[in-house]
Amino acid sequence: MSELYRFGISLEKTLIDAFDRHISAQHYKSRSEALRDLIREELLKKQWREGGSVAGAIVMTYDHHKRELLNMLLDIQHDFQETIISTQHVHLDHHHCLEIIAVRGTADQVEKLATQLKVQAGVKHLSLSISTAG
């Protein structure tokens, strides 16, 4: 673990009270842990905006009986084989499937993949969760 630095900050009482309620609801053990997570999240957003390298997961549900949807999804995934690390396919019921796609690459590549999958007719829902690649 890297060396820890202590510093002080000044906040309005209403802001710190709201923050304390938030960290309590999220079960943080301390303000420091919550603040570290907020800083990491903001740095990740900056990395995303600047096109840096990210890792993450695309989670989508779709109707596998929709004509030609499976072929389209597979074609798109093959076009992004350098971005996709792995996929997991789950049968939810007779008509619906859940697919989890682990990804790594530039933010632009990952977002382009997610968008191309999301707009296909028959895709019910798609969410993208990103994290740092390192």
Swiss-Prot record:
Which Pfam families does the annotation name? NikR_C (PF08753), RHH_1 (PF01402)
Report the cofactors: Ni(2+)
Q: Name the Gene Ontology molecular function terms of this record.
A: DNA binding; DNA-binding transcription factor activity; nickel cation binding
Which SUPFAM superfamilies does its entry note? ACT-like, Ribbon-helix-helix
Keywords, alphabetical: DNA-binding, Metal-binding, Nickel, Transcription, Transcription regulation
Note on cofactor: Binds 1 nickel ion per subunit.
Q: What is this protein called?
A: Putative nickel-responsive regulator
**UniProt source species:** Chlorobium limicola (strain DSM 245 / NBRC 103803 / 6330)
Does Transcription regulation appear among the keywords? yes
Q: What positions does the entry give for Ni(2+) binding?
A: H78, H89, H91, C97
The family database entries (InterPro entries) matched by this protein are listed as: Acetolactate_synth/TF_NikR_C, ACT-like_dom_sf, Arc_rbn_hlx_hlx, CopG, CopG/NikR_regulator, Ni_resp_reg_NikR, Ribbon_hlx_hlx, TF_NikR_Ni-bd_C
Q: What does this protein do?
A: Transcriptional regulator.
Family according to the record: Belongs to the transcriptional regulatory CopG/NikR family.
Q: Which GO terms describe its biological process?
A: response to nickel cation
